[in-house]
Amino acid sequence: MKRKNLLYTLVFGSLIIFSNMIIAQENTSIQNEKAVYELINRVLPHDATQFKVAFIPKENEKDLFEIESVNGKIMLRGNNGISIASGLNYYLKNFAHCQITWNGTNLNLPNPLPMVSKKIQRKSPYKYRYYLNYCTFNYTMSWWNWERWQKEIDWMALNGINMPLAVTGQNSVWKRVYNNLGFTDKELESFFSGPAYFNWFWMGNLDGWGGPLPKSFMDGHEAMQKKILNQERLLGMAAILPAFTGHVPPTFKDKFPDTKLKQTSWVGFPNVNILDPNEPIFTEIGKRFIEEEIRTYGTNHLYSADTFNENTPPTNDSVYLNNVSQKVYQSMALADPQATWIMQGWLFYHSDKFWKTKEIKALLNAVPNDKMIVLDLWSERFPVWKRTQAYYGKPWIWNMLHNFGQNINLSGLMSSVANNPAEALHNPQSRKMLGIGLTMEGIEQNPVIYDLMLENVWRDTPIDLDSWLKDYALRRYGKKNTNADKVWQILSRTVYADTITNGGAESIITARPTFQENPGGTSTTKLPYNPLELVKAWNLIMAASNDLKNSDGFQFDVVDITRQVMANYATIVQQQIAIDYKNKDSKAFKKNSAQFIVLISDLDNLLSTRKDFLLGNWLNDAKKWGNTPEEKELYEKNARNLITLWGDRDNRLHEYACKQWSGMLNGFYKIRWEKFFDQVNRDMVQNKEFDQKLFDEVMKDWEWNWVNATETYTTEIKGDAVKSAMRMHSKYYKTILKAYK
């Protein structure tokens, strides 16, 4: 009788569990469908009712979407929210000739909406479509709120991203872990960095810079991360959470005196402590962190950890390197047996003199092949997979890096992006290439190169660049224009054919003032193309102005191209000033230096016409996170510091994240150049040799004062973008043309 009751209990209990699973799945499906409809409504608030959605299964384990017209509506089908959103974007681009980008959007849909006469189906050949770089979370996203994040997640879904890095909100998790290990909040103040420097703190490059970090910021980011992850997962994304790589607080030895630590330094910042992976507490801390992270955020079983980020290991001993990887992975797997380690392959490029075959194999082979995925971080330019036999059998992802420091310049490598993902996919030597992705340090710039890269998501063949660019211009501007087509042809073979610079050339305007044409440091002013060709494109886009002036995308492009032409021309003027100084021609020096200052002012006025180029937005968004005057001041200082000195007054990364923004030009760069010209002029009058080193020291003090200042910059655009660009063209075109000829 007992056995019969037990059997009844087991069967009935199983039925309850099974029915609960079905209900849970149905609820999840309902939530997913709701999330997709909400996305459509956010993107197309006036036309959302014209679209219907339905979920269908994968085909041969491949994500897919279908589009067709049913009863006068556009039916979007897909295996998850991402696929359906991608179907929507495909329809918008290819049927409605519309476009959604960070910098200019065209959603002027035809009325009535075009019908899809024959069902369209697209499958992605890539299991993973990765997005983001640790650096993006600071160079672009330091001050984002939930509204901005939601907009980005929509954009990710529309473009097929299914594997985003999600490292927001980890400091509160670390705080709880270290509190439980006996560290006080006061001790952690010297550990956690300020908000603009999280990336480099997380990767073990620095401690405490820009802090102390208020608890309110940690709590706010934890709440926001929950929203981010919920939205990403509802749409079908598998988010990558951070893991432990050994970076521990400065007072770690006080709590654990017998543990072995090594100290590393990075670009002049004070040493940080890295816990020896052989110490038993290494895996214990890593396990505790993952456990607390899962409790807080849930998991998709994907974890990011980067060992030796821009730091050389203390030894190339294979046993040591193997052991490091083993312990990092173990710390994940002890907390989550399903853990897969997502590793950025940046170290193999950045420190390629150290990372040879033996060393790379030692690091990678410690982890089972099915438990690690390597991000080939700069595939469009320096594909490490080609010199590592595709990471010796590890699954890996082809990525476009493109941008450094969210610098503002026209640059990219279109031919590589259009051809190489598909070529790698079909190359037997690529072995376990499982996806493609974007790993830029900063976004909200050069939208064309990202649109091009993401065109690869739903195709397995190279992109015909000439044809694609014509379609791009049509989508962007809303109508065909011959001059616009010619502009993009010129851009594709000049600024977007850059095989020389790393992330594009900077303008001499943003350099610390000097007579040198190319001051060096963290960037170059050397152009990888003939600037006269860009002037031709400038003339052509101005010729299209009357026809396309109402297009948001055109307004951005005409300002951006004008900006680049003027930024390039600044070097011509600066070098003439250098000649004037060498010739001791005081009159010419005054005339040309005045012209240089006017050029900066004109550039600032031009950029003030677009929200994309306002310093005020960056600073104001930072201050919005503050709950007290002290917090607002701290966040503003972080925001100012990152885009100027980067660290203290002597930091060699100064100007790494320079910005050609309205407000920065007049409020920072112009003032530096005015001080430079004033000092040189005084020296010329007194017949003295200009002392560059002394001037630099004076400038560092002024720059540090600017970092700590609080003057306000506008968040409101002023003037008409196209008219402003036309004025610049009228004023400078003939002069610039003559200078290059």
Predicted features and spans:
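Bacterial Sec-dependent N-terminal signal peptides
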Residues: 1-29
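Contiguous, structured surface segment used for ligand recognition
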Residues: 25-126
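Second-shell loop/turn segments in exported
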Residues: 26, 72-78, 137-143, 215, ...
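Acidic/histidine-rich, surface-exposed loop or edge segments in extracytoplasmic proteins
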Residues: 68-73, 133-137, 208-209, 553-557, ...
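Catalytic-core regions of glycoside hydrolase
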Residues: 99, 105-113, 132-136, 157, ...
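Catalytic and substrate-binding clefts that recognize carbohydrates or anionic sugar/phosphate headgroups
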Residues: 120-121, 144-147
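Active-site-adjacent substrate/metal-binding segments within catalytic domains
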Residues: 126-145, 156
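Histidine-centered catalytic/metal-binding microenvironments
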Residues: 520-741
